[in-house]
Design a protein with these regions (language model features):
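Beta-strand-rich modules
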Residues: 145-169
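A short beta-turn/strand-edge loop motif at beta-sheet boundaries
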Residues: 11-19, 106-112, 145
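A mature extracytoplasmic/lumenal domain signature
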Residues: 61-63, 119, 141
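Surface-exposed loop/turn and intrinsically disordered segments
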Residues: 30-101, 170-174
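Short helix-loop boundary/capping segments
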Residues: 79-139
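Short, low-complexity, Pro/Ser/Thr/Gly-rich segments in the mature regions of secreted, periplasmic
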Residues: 173-184
């Protein structure tokens, strides 16, 4: 076992009610239209989008989608680790949270955190304010995820909604950390 490896991968997704909105870029990187959604896929010559303290979006506009140029001036939250064990009992309460002592964690820009427990039997989740440092899933809730290989996940996010002549657009910055666990 070599321990935890933290790797940040910056990607972007946009959807305009499955409409073609023309060219869409995030931080200058063009997104590809695929099955109604625009997606930046890391790889090739650009391995990641490097997000800073703001995120710039440009949408050419087409049909019912207006042209949009917007810089969302909040940082994407970063999670470097979770404060959780690698073996988790489904027969008792589980409390875990973001490891705020980890040097890679920079989640101060988050408004909320969505916590998940995923297992072979199902998934459970809770959303809390970013100021809440841990979340507890009860023994009763844990019984729904089953036993075996699973993972814990935290998604810290912030968002704003902008209006373009009646066309509302939500801009969401989200940082996610996933930890593989054994559910016993």
């Amino acid at each position: 076992f070599i321990g935890t490896i933290t790797q940040f991968v910056g990607t972007a997704v946009a959807n305009f009610d499955n409409s073609d909105a023309g060219m869409v870029t995030c931080e200058g990187e063009e997104l590809s239209l695929n099955n109604g959604s625009y997606i930046f896929t890391p790889g090739g010559t650009v391995a990641t989008i490097d997000f800073g303290s703001s995120v710039a979006w440009a949408v050419a506009g087409k049909g019912s989608v207006p042209p949009i140029n917007y810089t969302y001036s909040r940082a994407v939250p970063q999670i470097g680790a979770l404060d959780a064990e690698s073996s988790v009992s489904t027969a008792s309460d589980l409390t875990f949270g973001i490891d705020y002592t980890n040097s890679f964690t920079a989640a101060g820009s988050a408004d909320s955190v969505l916590y998940y427990v995923h297992g072979p039997g199902g998934s459970i989740h809770k959303t809390v304010a970013a100021s809440v440092r841990t979340v507890t899933f009860t023994k009763s809730e844990m019984s729904a995820v089953g036993t075996g290989a699973g993972y814990l996940q935290a998604a810290a996010y912030n968002y704003t909604v902008q209006n373009y002549n009646g066309y509302k657009v939500a801009f969401v910055n989200e940082g996610v950390f996933t930890k593989g666990v054994t559910l016993e």
